[in-house]
Amino acid sequence: MDYKDLAELIFPDVKDISYYEEKYPERNLQEGAVVTRFAPSPTGFVHIGGLYQALVARTVAKKTGGVFFLRVEDTDQKREVENGVTGIVNSLKDFDMAPDEGMISDTEEIGNYGPYKQSLRKEIYQAYAKYLISQGKAYPCFCTQEELDEIRQKQESAKIRPGYYGVWAKCRNLTVEESAEKIKNGEPYIIRFKSPGREDRKIKHKDVIKGNVDFPENDLDIVIIKADGLPTYHFAHAVDDHLMHTTHVIRSDEWLSSVPLHLQLFHELGFKAPKYAHISPIMKNDNGGKRKLSKRKDPEAAVEYYKKEGIPSEAVKEYLLNIANSTFENWRKANPDKSIDEFDFQLNKMSVSGALFDMIKLLDIGKTVISKMTAEEVYNYSLIWAKEYDEELAKMLEDKEYALKVFGIERGNKKPRKDISKWSDVMYNIGYMYDDEFYGKVNEYPYQVISDKEDIAKILDLYISKYYNESDDKQTWFDKIKELAVEMGYAGEVKEFKANPGMYKAHVGDVSTVLRVALTARTNTPDMYEIMQVLGKNRIAKRLEVAKENLK
């Protein structure tokens, strides 16, 4: 009996690997095209770090005319959560990052290199495991959990490196006949890789991001096929990325130490290894120290958080590119109106150390992104968000014609309004334009410099009775406020007041503030002329009257 007989005994009904090599031929892509993948496990919510990896992988593929695909690594089925795959697929859709190939729903996929769900590729992995066994490069291991625990305890007592290797690999040196006998006797087993490595030898590896890295060779006889017949991550990665013709594996740097093993697997399987690019994690400032964004501690670690907050997907992607390449910020300053797809992203320019997450910076980008949208776009995005997360806002936006006027205030100017950073800001920033919201929440009027109640009442009275005309253009409108200011003993120009502060009670800007506060209960709003044009004469008259009543 030889290795081939043993392989046939273990996997009698699987196809020869030549079948799969023919089924998944080289991709017909232009020279230099990069093939990348996002390969998450459906074991919980999608982490912002996962989205970061996916964005980088997709950007690199798109830039080179390559392919970006989604593969679901669901071989650890005990940890799989309900709707885990759906959550992954929807997260990519939400950020306009749908893959060129792979899973497009929990059960549907597109592309010619599937299945793209590892649990459906069991026979493929077994075919390649059979090949390794037939070559004497893998073997069945019959060690029980108790025996493995005993090995670990002995290693700990002797203070030597733990693991299944060398003299500790009890089943490595079983003869073919001994292994066959145990299998025929019904002893349970798994399949281990027979590592040709030695820990006292070094390998040199050039990571696309980290640069040159030295590692000890892998000498562990790792499990490649588990008792349930499914592969481990390491083995599935090698087989899948070979058959799917991945050219660049872009993943978290927590996998950097696995490179020696993965390169060894590729070599022993006779595959060409892909290039590896290990991304540093996104960090958080925690009391002066740096730590990884935590699923447990940080709500912003979950991709779902950004959707609930209503932070535009374009802003999140722009922010992630900002921390991915240090050249992005200068590019954006030079090209304020270009799509992020036009940025010349460089994988090898990514930071070797983890970037600090900056929510203030992200929200600032959100303001810029929203400021460039049309009123119609802002309305549509706000309504989509509100229907899922804010019933009151959704009801408010039912009058589309009025809402478009509200969102049109200071939009389309050379310097458009930048008060909305996320869709959850919308209610706060436009609520005062709606009577139900305004009267339901106004409880004080912060008038600022002019605080004398008689003066305030007179300003409001004179304005509506003598000066306001809804057909006035902006210059005429402001000239009339100046006239009102002068009539009331205030400076008609700010510079007049600054030159002779003793001659005036205040200036035209302070009079404008009285009107602003009376109409909006805010001291800071977008352009008052535009606000008043949208509110209209009847609303304005009523609000000024209510403000006067509030003075009593």
Where are the predicted features?
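Residue-level signal for inorganic ion chemistry
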Residues: 57, 88, 132, 136, ...
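Active-site cores that bind ATP or allylic diphosphates and position pyrophosphate for catalysis
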Residues: 139-278, 283-293, 302, 460-471, ...
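Helix-rich, typically C-terminal accessory recognition domains appended to large enzymatic cores
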Residues: 479-488, 492-535, 539
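Short amphipathic alpha-helical segments and their helix-coil junctions
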Residues: 33-37, 69, 299, 339-347, ...
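Catalytic adenosine-cofactor/nucleotide-binding cores of aminoacyl-tRNA synthetases and other
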Residues: 269-450, 520-552
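Glycine- and acidic
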Residues: 36-43, 69-74, 243-249, 300-302, ...
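N-terminal Rossmann-like or analogous alpha/beta NTP/dinucleotide-binding catalytic cores
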Residues: 2-157, 257-271, 315
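A generic secondary-structure signal for well-formed alpha-helical elements
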Residues: 92-99, 133-140, 152-155, 159-162, ...
